[in-house]
Each structure stands twice: as structure tokens, then as C-alpha cells.
């Protein structure tokens, strides 16, 4: 195996610490070609689709990609941002805003770290961002996936890709991984404040008359739970902690699972049928919040805010409220900083004094170092 060449080592160089935020990914454009390229990478991951490759890949390339690329492109087109200050895929826009906000907050607290974001599928790729961090002299990297609840289909595959990339390096950085933060007090507090702020602006549901808060998480095949994936349990715990923080009784909120793909049984109850059933029984108001998505994306903006609202109202529901995700809200940025700092303990968060760096370089040169 040939390992990649390294930048020339500089004595007296101040090693930097980096925080790498990783999210799922997005197509480069809302076009069938770009969406097809993204879906091919995403659905080819054996962590995502646990079907024997010999059976799955012909189906993926021969049926699924030709059919889904155009349909999905229309959905991306419906949510694509085209404002002067926000242009592109919502997931990428909000992910970059999160990284910039976290960078500002760390700087304000005197922590000299580099914050970057990458996507597991699509761009900016984990490989390209890790390479950029290497060239900036980052020798410690904290990988913080934007998946509060751990799953082999999300968190693990992000770690897999980091390991794959670093496996090609000759001089690897020191690495730390954040597995999950589904019950972290700062995360729960940020969720609580996000819902509370929305209710302060738009009024609270009338729970006494039967209004309901739906907490919709991304679904995964039920088989993953049976094989030991903790995702289902962590979603339920997040939902319970958020419900308690909001002062709600168990019947006033419900955890559901969305984005089912294929015919296999997934985690239940499913979000769409739940919304339709609430509409049928005449629910006056339903609020939907997606705690497992720290940034708004196609699953929240199109599947919930558009399709979910239609499901509810066509079935007879009246008042539908979609509560935006955390995005770059201040409480969430502060929570990210708190989570990161807990995992950064013991790593350098400040640059040594220039005199100390020069002394290191001089000592190395007296021993024959070239630079």
C-alpha cells in the first residue's frame, strides 16, 4: 500500500486542534444528475442498506436510481435556498452556519481551535476537509457527528470514512470521537429553548383540548434494533427528557419515526400515518418537531413541513405547526461548544508563545534539522 505524502515538517510549528462537524450529506444541485450521484454514494453504503451487494447493487442501479433521482430532485428544488445571504442546500447552508457560529464562540472564549464541517456523502467530503485541516497544521481532531442519537447507519459510517481516509496517511493526527449526545443536558436544554421560543411567538398548543406535540425522528429498519443498535432507545430517551423539560404529560407528546424506505418494517409508529390519524380524529392543532435533526434538511422542510402538513389536513386536521430545527440558534451553538470542550480536555487550545516556538526550532536546528 502506498501512503499519501505529507507536508514538509516544520520545527517550531504550533500544532492546532480541530473540531470536525459531520452531517449526512446533500446533492450539489437540485437536478436529477446531481441527486443521482448523491443517492448512488449514499445507498451504496453497506452501513445504510444491509442487503447482500450481489442482490442490492443491480436493483439500485437498474431501478431505484433511475426512478428516484428525478422525483427526489423535484423535492430538493422545492426547498433549495436562493436568498442573498443563504444560497444552496439547506443542510449545507445551516451546517456551515453552525461551524462558523461555533468557531466565533470558541474564539470569544479564547480557545484557538479550527472548526470545520464535512458531509459523509457529497461535498464537502470528509476526505477533502481532513486534508485541509492537515495543511493547516491540525494534529488533534475531534470528530463530532451531528447525530445526537447513535446509529450504525449514521454515526458509525461517519467514523468508518474518517478511519478510511486516515488509513492512507503516513502521519496521522490524534483522534477523538463523540459517539452520541442524546441525553446531554445542554442538548436537551437547546431543544427545550427552541420549542419554547416557537411557542412564545406562535402560541402554545391547547393540550387540554387534545392538541399534540409530535417528536419525529428519522427511522431505521426494525431489524437494526433487534441486532443491537441503540438508536431506538436513545430516541425514546431524548423524547422523554424533552417532554419532561417542557412540563408535558406522556399523552401530550408522541415519538414517531419518519422517512421509511422500502417494504421492510421500520421503527414505529410511523410519522405520516400518525399525522393522518390525528387529522381523522379531528385534532385541532398538531406541532411537529424533529429533535434528531440539528439542521433543517429535506427530511424536515419537505417531508414534514410540506408532506406531513398535507397528510394531516387532507385527513381533516386543522392547525399544523412545524417547529424549525436547532440550526444555528444560540442555545445550540453553546451546547455544541459545551459538548466539544468536554471531549477536548487535555488537548492544546492555545498557541504557545512565539519565543517558545522559536526556541524549539533553534534546538532542532542545532541537532541538524533542516527547518
From Swiss-Prot:
The compartments listed are: Cytoplasm
Q: Which Gene3D superfamilies match?
A: 3.40.50.1400
EC class name: lyase
Is Cytoplasm tagged as a keyword? yes
Q: Please list the disulfide bridges.
A: none
Recorded hits in Pfam families, A to Z, give: Ferrochelatase
Q: Which Gene Ontology cellular component annotation is one that this UniProt entry carries?
A: cytoplasm
Instruction: Classify the main location.
Output: cytoplasm
**What are the entry keywords?**
Cytoplasm, Heme biosynthesis, Iron, Lyase, Metal-binding, Porphyrin biosynthesis
> SUPFAM superfamilies under this entry?
Chelatase
Work out whether the entry's keyword set contains DNA-binding: no
What does the entry list as the binding residues for Fe cation?
218, 299
What biological processes does GO assign it? heme biosynthetic process
| Biological or metabolic pathway of the protein | Porphyrin-containing compound metabolism; protoheme biosynthesis; protoheme from protoporphyrin-IX: step 1/1
**Biological role stated in the UniProt entry:** Catalyzes the ferrous insertion into protoporphyrin IX.
Family per UniProt? Belongs to the ferrochelatase family.
**What is this protein identified as?**
Ferrochelatase
What is the organism lineage in this UniProt record? Bacteria, Pseudomonadati, Pseudomonadota, Betaproteobacteria, Burkholderiales
Q: Which gene encodes it?
A: hemH
